[in-house]
Amino acid sequence: MAFPAPAFSLANLLNGSYGVDTPEEVERVRSEQRDEAAAACRNYRPLPAVDVSESVPEDAHSLRTPDGAPSEEVSVEFVTYGAEDYLEKSDDELLVAFETMVKPMRIGQLWCPAFNKCSFISSIAMARALLLAPRTSHRTMKCFEDLVAAIYTKSDFYYDDECEADDVQIDISSRDVPGYSFEPWSRTSGFEPPPICEACDMIMYQCPCFDFNALKKSCAERTFADDYVIEGLDGVVNNATLSSNLGPFLVPVKCPYEKCPTPVGEIPPDLNRATDRVDINLVQSICDSTLPTHSNYDDSFHQVFVESADYSIDLDHVRLRQSDLIAKIPDSGHMIPVLNTGSGHKRVGTTKEVLTAIKKRNADVPELGDSVNLSRLSKAVAERFFISYINGNSLASSNFVNVVSNFHDYMEKWKSSGLSYDDLPDLHAENLQFYDHMIKSDVKPVVSDTLNIDRPVPATITYHKKGITSQFSPLFTALFERFQRCLRERIILPVGKISSLEMAGFDVKNKHCFEIDLSKFDKSQGEFPFKIQEHILNGLGCPAPITKWWCDFHRFSYIRDRRAGVGMPISFQRRTGDAFTYFGNTIVTMAEFAWCYDTDQFEKLLFSGDDSLGFSVLPPVGDPSKFTTLFNMEAKVMEPAVPYICSKFLLSDEFGNTFSVPDPLREVQRLGTKKIPCSDNDEFLFAHFMSFVDRLKFLDRMTQSCIDQLSLFFELKYRKSGEEAALMLGAFKKYTANFQSYKELYYSDRRQCELINSFSCVELRIERSSSTKQREKKDGIERRRNDKRRTPTGSYGGGEEAETKVSQAESTGTRSQKSQREGAFKSQAVPLPTILSSRWFGTDRDVPPCEHGGIVRV
């Protein structure tokens, strides 16, 4: 029974009766829609002729088409819900319907095509109208869901499986649909579907195998260990003393590592070029203009001034013992440089000199840090160290077996110095808190223009004896090699056989450089860096008993200089000459850097002792004040920063490879060094020449682009002319060409003195060889048996040989004076042809030996 629609009134409007369809009204509307749909299906094609007398029964719910008409079922879904019904649905229900009909592709949180409520409802309304409209094409129209998707994505409304290639598409834009125009359109947005994972048939962006966040945590960065393979294991002889000192974990095997050959894609051409004419005056003028205060520097009598002048110093807990000082052993002299570059003479470790060095290098420890919780914060810094630098998988899989082999290599190295296995002490019976102390005789050249007001102070060395160092050094060497193999690829420690400053495929140009200068690094290290390195050593795999043992006798130590008679106690500061100096300084610098700066913002990080250098695309962000307030370090950020580390500039060639170039200013200063000992055959000078050539092997790679880079970096660092740096390269090219050119830089006055004194101390004897006893002793003058300065022997009369003998004259007594007078007389009486063979003058006759006898004084 149908109820009449409610009348319009204020009461019906307020109670919600008016405007709401009753169930009977809804059923009536849907019945009319089904009737219209059935009529549309009947009108799809003309009905065949039938007898009028025959009645065709029809059912409103089950429609049967006549024979020959297409049998299609009327979709109830699109009839049941019209556009007005979708307007009443919620957004979640519309999203479900959109995903069911349009079937969008999900990429992360995005849908393609994107959902638009108005467009989706309009597509539904248009699809409903198209299905109800008379069909004018013989092509099969898509079903309701596909038709909605086609209208939403503006694609074809018909299926393509029944379409022939030669058929002419009908312009459906001519359909009589008011307000709409339809035309076939293919997607031309350039969208490409994402790749599908073969393992789980999911989009790779959604596949857990390709989750980038998971990959970042699970897959570690490439390390140095990926470039090195194990060649094999070699057995070595174990040593009982070493095993008893360092523990039973030592394995008597050797595990060598070799670097995998790097594929070379491009071979740089030969870049050797001729240079301009360089002379010694040009090099000296470069030194005078670049180092104005160095050209007049002369410290020949510096030691005399130190010992004779008044001296005052303020030190605490210093012990002086002046009773048994070791006297200085005089040396044989040194080569004198032609260039004056401000280099100093060797320093002698006297009491005053040692006290001055201790005052600067060991005493007056700065107190700049704040009070912190050492235990908690040291563990946090060590944890940050491993997260920033270490590949945990490589650390877990690396070995630690080369201790014994390194020990034997160390013993072979110092075997010539008298170190043997029998001399190894028992470390448990030694007091390891006592260190020997000395100063470096060679003073590091100064590049600042302060030599007119200041004199450089020599550095100090605090060390154990070789017998003690030989047992700890192999352990830390093996641990350092393991540490290097586990570093991430962008972390470089330029030391050892598996790392260097040569970086292939990395260009330093167009990068932000970052350099931290840490002053007073050794003596500023307190208990906090000490605890940090203890946690890091345990994390790297060093046996805990050895780590604790090593750290215990470094908490409080006593240094003593036996030559100067000076001793004083020290605490946590770094020992400059023990087995852990470089390794310890490097890990402390890396830990402090990782705590103050985020290492992920750098493309490359280089560390070496207290030196650090970073390269980044964007300006680095961090807090350098923590170096001072937290770690008690005097830190200075270098501005402007240049690629400079370990006294070397880093340059990039045209092939995108980076190589190191020694600082030209320091190399020029080394050309004027005063520490080369004198020798008869120039062996020490030749050793310095070979070292000079090895350091300057980069000259063959210096193109004009590299020279321009070096000039620019030189100007930025020293505020000096970059053109002079290019002139220095020309001088280096000349003096590395051959040894004769390098010898022009040095001379020795000792040879001149020997030449003058040789007239009174050397005698030339030419005599007939008679018997062995006569050759050994004649006229009371002993002949030097092992003298190698002999002239070639010649043949005299009778086929006998004559030889030239050089012997030392008697220094004292009347006989020496008499022999000198006789020699002077005979040297005037005997002519030169009597000394030389007559064959030298073109005569072949034999001269009697008696005419050539006697002694000739030169």
UniProtKB/Swiss-Prot annotation:
One of its GO terms (biological process) is positive stranded viral RNA replication. Its EC number is 2.7.7.48. Interacts with replication protein 1a. The keyword Transferase applies. It is an enzyme of class 2 (transferase). Coiled coil: none annotated. Disulfide bonds: none annotated. Keywords: Nucleotide-binding, Nucleotidyltransferase, RNA-directed RNA polymerase, Transferase, Viral RNA replication. Residues 805-817 have a biased composition (Polar residues). Residues 511-624 form the RdRp catalytic domain. This is RNA-directed RNA polymerase 2a. It catalyses: RNA(n) + a ribonucleoside 5'-triphosphate = RNA(n+1) + diphosphate. One of its GO terms (molecular function) is RNA binding.
